């Protein structure tokens, strides 16, 4: 888990405590987070949308509040990744009824960090080209290098480590919206097309 590798000083700016975040039992972890964090000034969340929905709904049950702004009035930012956010957008808007809430989508996986929303007025993400990953894409049976992708086409993503020791089709599909710079929309398999 990445959280166990963070520097000691990050604990000054985050909640819950490291011990709580690392509880292996999911239900005990959720309860611990509710006990600790409902008394904190929380301004941001980060993580996988599905997991955060479970947590946020439990926080509302725990506190008896109707939305998260009643618990954390300064909540303004959610950085999310791991899955496409579109299916979760309405649920989050209901839990956090704020026009000022900022959602930052990232495309990360166990294999690496691939893209992020660098322009919050757009739905697509900027592909990270200098993070130690070699990209290829599969369209049917054809393998396409990054420089060969076409806007509007849906591809299965293949990543290779920079040292070439492993190559892996990660199971997600992307649609390129631009090739200068490379921007894409993320779909969880199968693609919507």
Region spans (language model):
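Active-site glycine/GP-rich loop and adjacent strand/helix microenvironment
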Residues: 2-189, 193
């Amino acid at each position: 888990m990445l959280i166990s590798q963070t520097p000691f000083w990050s604990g000054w700016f985050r909640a819950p405590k490291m011990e709580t975040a690392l509880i292996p039992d999911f239900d005990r972890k959720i309860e611990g987070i509710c006990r600790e964090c409902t008394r904190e000034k929380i301004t941001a969340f980060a993580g996988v949308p599905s997991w955060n929905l479970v947590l946020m709904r439990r926080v509302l049950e725990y506190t008896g509040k109707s939305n998260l702004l009643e618990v954390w009035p300064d909540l303004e930012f959610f950085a999310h990744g791991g899955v496409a956010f579109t299916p979760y957008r309405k649920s989050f808007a209901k839990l956090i009824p704020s026009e000022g809430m900022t959602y930052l989508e990232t495309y990360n996986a166990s294999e690496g960090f691939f893209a992020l929303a660098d322009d919050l007025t757009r739905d697509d993400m900027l592909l990270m080209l200098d993070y130690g990953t070699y990209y290829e894409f599969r369209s049917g049976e054809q393998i396409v290098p990054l420089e060969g992708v076409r806007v509007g086409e849906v591809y299965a993503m293949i990543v290779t480590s920079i040292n070439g020791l492993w190559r892996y089709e990660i199971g997600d599909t992307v649609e390129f919206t631009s090739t200068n710079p490379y921007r894409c929309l993320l779909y969880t398999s199968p693609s919507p097309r």
